[in-house]
Amino acid sequence: MSISSDEAKEKQLVEKAELRLAIADSPQKFETNLQTFLPPLLLKLASPHASVRTAVFSALKNLISRINTLPQVQLPVRALIVQAKEPNLAAQQDSTNVRLYSLLLASKGIDRLSLQDRQQLLPLVVSNISCLTGTVAARMFHILLKLILEWVAPQESSHEQEEFVQFLQLDNDGFSFLMRQFTRFFLLVPSKQVQVSQQPLSRGYTCPGLSLTDVAFFTYDAGVTFNKEQLNKFKKAIFQFVCRGMAATQTIEQSPRMIELMEFLCVVSTDSTNLSDDAAQFMKRFPMPYENEEFITFLQTLYIGNTANGRPPVKAILQEKILSILNRSHFATTKAECISLICSIGLHSSEYKLRSLTLSFIRHVAKLNYKNLNPASSSPSSTDFSTCIVSLIRNNLHAEGWPKLQLGPQTPAFNTAILQRQLQYETLGDILKRDFELVSDLSYIEFLFESLKNDLPQFRSSIQESLLSLVGHLSILPQQSKLKLKNLLRKNLSIDEQQREDNNDAVNSIMALKFVSIKFTNAAFPFHDPEARLFNIWGTVRTNRFDIIEESFKGLQPFWFRVNNASINTSATVKTSDLLGSHLSETEFPPFREFLQVLIDQLDSEAASITRKSLNNAVRFSKQCLISNAIYGKKTMVIQDEDWSVRIDKALELDDTVVSRVNEMVQGMNDDIFIRYLTLLSNEFTATNSKGEQIAIFPYQDPIFGSVLLTLLNFVSNNVLRRLEILVPDLYHLVIMKFQSLSDNDLAVCATIIGIISTAIADSTHVKRITKIAQSQTMAETYVASYVVPRLYLKDQTNHIESDSILNLLNILTTHLSHPGTNKDMILKLVCQVTKFGLLLQVSAQERKDFLKKVMDTIQDKLINDVTAIQTWSYLSLYSTDLENSSLFQEKLLETNVSKQNDFLFSVGESLSVVAGKWSSKYLIKQIDIPNFNVEIMQQKFPATNVTTILDEIFSGCDSTKPSLRKASCIWLLSYIQYLGHLPEVSSKCNDIHLRFMRFLADRDEFIQDSAARGLSLVYEIGGSDLKESMVKGLLKSFTESTAGSASTSATGISGSVSEETELFEPGVLNTGDGSISTYKDILNLASEVGDPALVYKFMSLAKSSALWSSRKGIAFGLGAIMSKSSLEELLLKDQQTAKKLIPKLYRYRFDPFQAVSRSMTDIWNTLIPESSLTISLYFNDILDELLCGMANKEWRVREASTSALLQLIQSQPQEKFSEKMLKIWTMAFRTMDDIKDSVREVGTKFTTVLAKILARSIDVEKGVNPTKSKEILDNILPFLWGPHGLNSDAEEVRNFALTTLIDLVKHSPGAIKPFTPKLIYDFITLFSSIEPQVINYLALNAANYNIDANVIDTQRKNGVTNSPLFQTIEKLINNSDDCMMEEIINVVIKASRKSVGLPSKVASSLVIIILVKRYSIEMKPYSGKLLKVCLTMFEDRNESVNIAFAISMGYLFKVSALDKCIKYSEKLITKYFEPTSTENNKKVVGTAIDSILNYAKSEFDNVASVFMPLIFIACNDEDKDLETLYNKIWTEASSSGAGTVKLYLPEILNVLCVNIKSNDFSIRKTCAKSVIQLCGGINDSIPYPQIVKLFDISREALSGRSWDGKEHIVAALVSLTEKFSQTVADNNDLQESINHVMYTEVSRKSMKYVKKILPLYARYINVNPQEETITFLIEKAKEMIRLLGSESDDSEGSIKQTSDESTIKRIKPNTEITQKSSKENIENEEYVINLLKVSVDICNNSKSRYPMNLLEFIIDEIAYLFHNDRIIHTWRTQLAASEIGISIVGRFSTISSADFIQNVGRLWDQTFPINCNKETIENVKLQMIKFGGLIIQKIPSLQNNIEENLRLLNSIDSTSRIELELKNIGL
């Protein structure tokens, strides 16, 4: 077959390329050829001709073999990658092979590249990587992995990191592609198949989270496989590359890149390597995007997997991570399909944690988006999903063991299992709570009840909570379910826990079951359901837990039942009034008959035990049902509020409506159930029958049975009573057999019941037996007879009673009464029974009279304190017509007023009503307990006779001044009107009664007030319309008019006139120590004795307050009672004047500090004013005026109430209403803050706080307030706040509050306050000193007295200013101000700094200057001069802290000052330092100022450095150590190089020295001299000659004149100069002569003290240039000085001795040689001489011409003098110095020949050795002497023998190892 020309051509090209590559004979050539030919060769793989492609493949095979053998050869990697991305081919050519082989060889080449080269390839590889497809993309991605494998991450948050991100140039598509693949790579797991090298790669395996295609991308398509180690290496590299490279700079929340990064980190955070921790930490840097759709969808997809592309769900650990995120996402609850799959996967998982998280997720969805758990909203494929979930959870619970958890091998750890099961129960509850359909068939409720009963205790609370969450559904259950629920609850509540007492857990489970059951009962069934109420009654069994009992009683109390049910109503919005129960409505009770039927049926059933145990509460509830049924829909006192229980208990005693309604109802009852019920009550009451058999079924005693039975018998028909005859034997048997053991109450109840039944069966044998009374019968029989016979008489049934039986009964009673051993109280009660029903009318008048007398005689003395005796006495009075002295009855009763017991007095009141009204008294009428009795019969027999008489007596008691009688009379009057008010004799006197009660309202005794108030309401009820009107008006008048009227007897007169004898206080109320104040006269006397007539008014005010106004409860009670029933609204509408007076006062009284008063007033307000807010709005101005007026009242209670009321008022009304009176309000507010009374001040503070907030709101321009209006308000208020009522007030509290208010205004309303900035800054600065506590000021002034450093206190005071909120406020003001205010602000700051007195204000001024400089640096320039001047002026302040503060401010000011100003004030600072009057403080301040300038204005400092640096240099040598430290610090910071800086500023330094070294201030001279010395150390010969001469001139001139303390420093300076510039001095004869002359002059001075100091300096000077005459002069002066040294001390010692002789007062220690030797003075003299001699030795050693032998002799003579004189006693110092001087003298020469010199040295040895060779001499001295001897032996042989002999002698005297060693060293 012929070959086409194209094919041949191409083939030829391939062969040529192959040949070129093959003939390359070195690796370098091979590499070069590869760079050229390899990419084009690979392009030929796209040839359409198979032969060409085959040739290329063949060539490649050879090439690759050769490349493999040459590892150093580099491949053209970049060209290959470019070619792989965009091969240079024709459009129709297939580029696949070209790309793949290019990448294959590129991948090989990468391994050979350096790290740097690899990094350079990264941008190329990642660019457009997202556009590549299939295998090419896979291989390119693998190349990227290889490139980043050894990539070195840049430093975190560094510039390099940012540069790297820029370098990558990654677009959004590329970023997304890489992040997607990197994330998937972390899901990759190694293949389990072992890969053999020859075997082709496997393509078919999946990983959790990755499909076949995904896995193939990383392995098959890329042509690689990974083992675990390689995989981990790549993962690590990827993580580094992503987090510290590619995505390092992602900071924008919710951006796509950030979301992709978070997806990546989520996956990595569960990786099996330690990268998971790093990823978790890295994630914390960013907020989790819980609500980002893309992010959440990605996680859901990972969790669920994808069936469409075959991607399985991820591993469980990652699923757990995903769920923990979904559990916090709202968006995750919005996709129903995803939710169903997530829950299904999680609940079917074998992983415990995943199951738990799934349960949490279900709860999360149920809470936020329940409908998505609901099948209706799910897709058709997941129908019934919600049901499916709960079924799944229930199945799981069954699988784990149900109803009790079973632990088996499959169960996780115990704690884990417990937690998960708890979560399952809670999740079940969450779902059921939201899905009524699941609850309606009760199957889950049954399931949970069973679990609660039987599962482990650990789950109890979870199950209970789940059950209780369902109560909202129960009321809407279908009827069938409700019946089922009722059976379930009946079963739960009737469980007898006592059978399982041994198992505590079981008992607790039953209790939990019962608690939930009671909750269900209350929620599911209406209140009128008798069975449900019976369940509640079962819950009250006393063996139940307290919470069950409490919940059960709530189900039996209609108020709490309503409140409870309102709170569990989940379906509708519930009113707050219903939740609080404040809106009262009437709840219907179960019908009485139905309830009885249910109760009796239960008692007859098999499970009767629970009913029996709760029978007492069943009976109690049955009584409540009866009453409630009877009065349903009627107005009575039984209101269903929280006190309903008390109301219903007392209703039959107090409310006639209730009695009549119940009577009607009970009269119609005659059925068997009712009789059965009454029999049951009787059986429970008697407990045993007449045969002694037990008939009670309730296990305990309870008086309720007897009490209810008696109550019912009061109303039943005669027919019923006759049917109850069978009860009489048992009841009679109870009294007879248990007479001694029964309580009085039970006896009375039992006898009364027998008495009532007897009236219907008078002819029965039982009654006949009881009424047949014999003298000999027992007390028990008498007891019953006493109850039965009088009732039979009432019913006119006595014809069956034998005539003597009644007489026998009376005789028995009188006999027992007179017998000492009997129970008198019981007998008297029987006498009451016999007498009150008129039985005595059955016997003859004489017999009656005898009986009455006997009883009266017995009880007459007991009346004062015995209630029974009092009652008996009143009943005896019924027969008073039979006695001569009938008035005795009332007299005896009236005498009981002395009693202090209120209850007793009420009993007397009841008795008085009987004495006065007989059977007309309501009290007596209520005693009738026989059904349907006509009381008029008795009223005819016992007509009322002396009603008026006794009423007049009571009036008289009311008007009495005797307190006890008044109190008793008040109570009696109340009883009188209560029980006899219906009689015309009483109602005709209503005016008088009303007046008495009005007066009692003013009584101090709260009980009397309450009684009087109640009395007023009763009077009001019985009065006519005219009376009612006048009463209301009178009360209002008394309430609104404060003036005390004259005495009045009309209905309106409350207060009487006060005369001298009017008793305002009970004795002892105002005890002063001298007796008590009882009358007006006493008050006058006391006031005049104190000398303050004004006290009279104070006491009068107190009296008024005590009587009426301070105890308004009385009037409030009265008002409340009257007003609740009167049409006061009409009255107020008609009478505007009254309304205007009453409403403001009443408003104020609502806030009275006394709770009782405020409570009563609030009641009145609520009663009187239906529309409170409307009324307040209408009468706002009147109320405001009343309150402002009240705030200034002299009575503290009025002030406090007014303030509290105003506080409430201004908070509830718009500001516009009171804006005009704002100043007045503020004034009064501040006045209350300074009140004398604590409580008023407290309320005042609250009030002003609220005012401040209102003010802040009203001026807040930022919140939209009109700026003009805001300014107008502030124009009014601010002058007030900073005026005499505010900041300048005398009261500290007011000042502080005004300040706080201003600070708050600045803080919260900066815009509004801006125009007032300058004034406020001035006020605030000056205020600093005022608000500083006085104690600190005192302490600062008296610091020395307390040993405290005043500077320390001042520092604290300064810190206090800086940290003060006030200063921060100033700062805020400045920050908010404008440039245009600058001049004004600066002027006020200058003014404040000048006018301020205290330290804090001055310091504040300086700090404000600093703030101004910082904030307005440019604007400040024109004012810098003024401010610098202020600073300089403030340097003169007496307080150092103030000086320092302004010095620091000066530093800041330099920053904004012009150069001329800087120079001017720099020079002023220099002048200030060198002033002759300058103190250390001044110098310190100057130093601080310079330091501040250096720190805060560096460039300005540099401009004036030539002014400052000389001063700093000189001041570094100040005598004061602190100053020296300060200036040294400044010098160090200011000078770039020490010596260089000195040279730089030397001319200026010399100028300053020249001017100041002759200063009048010697300390400055001294400082200058020290500076010269320091200069010598800092300069050298290179400085100009004129400057050297100038230095000498300065020093010489300074020495002219007399000697002064410190002049020696100038001498030292001159000597230092001479030493430094010795050559200059030697070359200049004139200079040398002049210095010689000056030195000679100074040494020749007469002041020996001065000469002593400069003599060593003179010796140093001679040492520079020794001359014979100067040496001779030195010897002369030195000798003279040494001889003088001891003489001073001799003189002083002489004087001491003399004193000692003259006086024996103080003993002086004897001045022995030892004490003198160690004295300071001796040591100083000795050291001085030694120093002088050593300097002299230096002169000898430095002599350049002839050796000064005379000086040597002088030295040796003086050493001898030191050893042997008695003025300076030598010590070891001289001994040591002698040897050292010897060593120095001998050691200078190598050989010594001078005989004089040798002689002198010998003399020195001879002087030294004898002194030093003692045993006592210290070792160091001896060692030094041995060295000296060794030198002599070495240099002067002629003295050798003598020396050696001496040294051997020394060794023999005191031989030590060190001495022996030293001797050995010198050859001995």
Curated annotation (Swiss-Prot):
UniProt repeat feature HEAT, residue ranges: 32-69, 116-153, 256-292, 313-351, 384-422, 439-476, 590-627, 707-745, 748-780, 781-818, 846-885, 945-982, 988-1025, 1030-1067, 1137-1174, 1178-1215, 1272-1311, 1361-1398, 1422-1459, 1503-1540, 1544-1581, 1649-1687, 1746-1785, 1830-1867
Coiled-coil ranges from the UniProt annotation: none
GO cellular component, as recorded: cytoplasm; nucleus; proteasome complex
N-terminal signal peptide: none
Subcellular location: Cytoplasm; Nucleus
Gene Ontology MF, one: molecular adaptor activity
Principal place of residence: cytoplasm
Modification sites for Phosphoserine: S1692
Domain of life: Eukaryota
GO biological process per UniProt: ERAD pathway; proteasome assembly
Pfam family name, one: ECM29_N
Modified residues (N-acetylserine): S2
InterPro entries (alphabetical): ARM-like, ARM-type_fold, Ecm29_N, HEAT_ECM29
Keywords recorded for this protein, A-Z: Acetylation, Cytoplasm, Nucleus, Phosphoprotein, Proteasome, Repeat
Subunit structure: Component of the proteasome. ECM29 binds to both proteasome 19S and 20S particles.
PANTHER family: PROTEASOME ADAPTER AND SCAFFOLD PROTEIN ECM29, TRANSLATIONAL ACTIVATOR GCN1-RELATED
Known role: Stabilizes the proteasome holoenzyme, probably by tethering the 20S proteolytic core particle and the 19S regulatory particle. The proteasome is a multicatalytic proteinase complex which is characterized by its ability to cleave peptides with Arg, Phe, Tyr, Leu, and Glu adjacent to the leaving group at neutral or slightly basic pH. The proteasome has an ATP-dependent proteolytic activity.
Note: Present with 2950 molecules/cell in log phase SD medium.
Protein name in UniProt: Proteasome component ECM29
Organism of origin: Saccharomyces cerevisiae (strain ATCC 204508 / S288c) (Baker's yeast)
Lineage: Eukaryota, Fungi, Dikarya, Ascomycota, Saccharomycotina
